[in-house]
Curated annotation (Swiss-Prot):
GO terms for biological process: response to toxic substance. May play a role in protection or detoxification. It is found in: Secreted. Residues 1-22 form the signal peptide. GO terms for cellular component: extracellular region. Its main location: secreted. The keyword Secreted applies. This is Submaxillary gland androgen-regulated protein 2, isoform beta. Keywords: Detoxification, Secreted, Signal. It comes from the Eukaryota.
Length: 41
C-alpha cells in the first residue's frame, strides 16, 4: 500500500514539474495533473 502511495506522489511531482515546462507538458498532456482542484489537500 505504501508503494502505491509513493508512486502516486512521484506521478504528481512529475506532473507539477512538467507543468512548469508548459510547452513539453502540453505535448505530453500531463500538466492538468498538477491542478490544485485535483489535489485532495
Amino acid at each position: 500500500m505504501k508503494a502505491l502511495y509513493m508512486v502516486f506522489v512521484l506521478w504528481v511531482l512529475i506532473g507539477c514539474f512538467l507543468r512548469l515546462l508548459k510547452d513539453e507538458a502540453t505535448v505530453f498532456g500531463l500538466w492538468p495533473l498538477c491542478s490544485y482542484r485535483m489535489l485532495p489537500f
